[in-house]
């Protein structure tokens, strides 16, 4: 088997592409114009900082970053310590409490410990303007994150993709189901969680698949405070 690439290889290759240069230039220009862009520049690529390429076991796919102050820090669904847990994550915690024995709902929404265990918390779009959801969609980020998913699809085996809602499911349509495991459910948003996200048991299912492959499971439990 060929040696696995690193994120440095994958992202480095994309950095040479004109679309990606344009994306980064657009974001930089927006910041330079005085607009509040989230997450801060140092956090935009945190999903890759905390989960190395060859450590990826599970991928959770989000849409775009939270657009309120101090929320987004580069990991989908996660917020910084001290920030109120957003509604979709509240529902993820409710499902975890039903799905994972002994799971206690923490007083925060900081999911970095998942990332450090091999859960790639990837948004489709990696930046957003304050108060304007989807404001940075169609600026090139989607192409970049497609390439990220394609790299995992091509070079890894047995990764569990948790695709919640039609956006994530459409994004993941080219994943090779013979090599990887794709678990779908409605989005945990309050608008759709009751349509089948609750009761879908994605977290225990992911761990069962990892056990079958002889991989270490994800400890979904979170510290009560951070």
Swiss-Prot record:
PROSITE patterns: U_DNA_GLYCOSYLASE. The active site is at 64 (proton acceptor). It comes from Vibrio campbellii (strain ATCC BAA-1116). Gene3D superfamilies: Uracil-DNA glycosylase-like domain. It is found in: Cytoplasm. One of its GO terms (cellular component) is cytoplasm. Its EC number is 3.2.2.27. Excises uracil residues from the DNA which can arise as a result of misincorporation of dUMP residues by DNA polymerase or due to deamination of cytosine. Keywords: Cytoplasm, DNA damage, DNA repair, Hydrolase. Pfam families: UDG. The keyword DNA damage applies. PANTHER family: URACIL-DNA GLYCOSYLASE. GO terms for biological process: base-excision repair, AP site formation via deaminated base removal. GO terms for molecular function: uracil DNA N-glycosylase activity. Belongs to the uracil-DNA glycosylase (UDG) superfamily. UNG family. This is Uracil-DNA glycosylase. InterPro entries: UDG_fam1, Ura-DNA_Glyclase_AS, Uracil-DNA_glycosylase-like, Uracil-DNA_glycosylase-like_sf. It catalyses: Hydrolyzes single-stranded DNA or mismatched double-stranded DNA and polynucleotides, releasing free uracil. The keyword Ligase does not apply.
């Amino acid at each position: 088997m060929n040696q696995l690439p690193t994120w440095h290889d994958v992202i480095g290759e994309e950095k040479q592409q004109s679309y990606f240069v344009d994306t980064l230039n657009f974001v930089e220009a927006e910041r330079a114009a005085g607009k509040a862009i989230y997450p801060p520049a140092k956090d935009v690529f945190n999903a890759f900082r905390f989960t190395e390429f060859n450590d990826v076991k599970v991928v959770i796919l989000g849409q775009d970053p939270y657009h309120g102050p101090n929320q987004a820090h580069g990991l989908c669904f996660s917020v910084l310590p001290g920030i109120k847990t957003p509604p979709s994550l509240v529902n993820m915690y409710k499902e975890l409490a039903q799905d994972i024995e002994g799971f206690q709902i923490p007083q925060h929404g900081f999911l970095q410990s998942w990332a450090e265990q091999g859960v790639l918390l990837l948004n489709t779009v990696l930046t957003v303007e304050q108060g304007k959801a989807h404001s940075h969609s169609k600026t090139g980020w989607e192409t970049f994150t497609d390439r990220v998913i394609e790299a995992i699809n091509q070079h890894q085996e047995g990764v569990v993709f948790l695709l919640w809602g039609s956006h994530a499911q459409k994004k993941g349509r080219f994943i090779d189901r013979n090599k990887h495991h794709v678990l779908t459910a409605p989005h945990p948003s309050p608008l759709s969680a009751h349509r089948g996200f609750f009761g879908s048991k994605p977290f225990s299912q992911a761990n069962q698949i990892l056990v079958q492959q002889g991989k270490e499971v994800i400890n979904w439990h979170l510290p009560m405070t951070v």
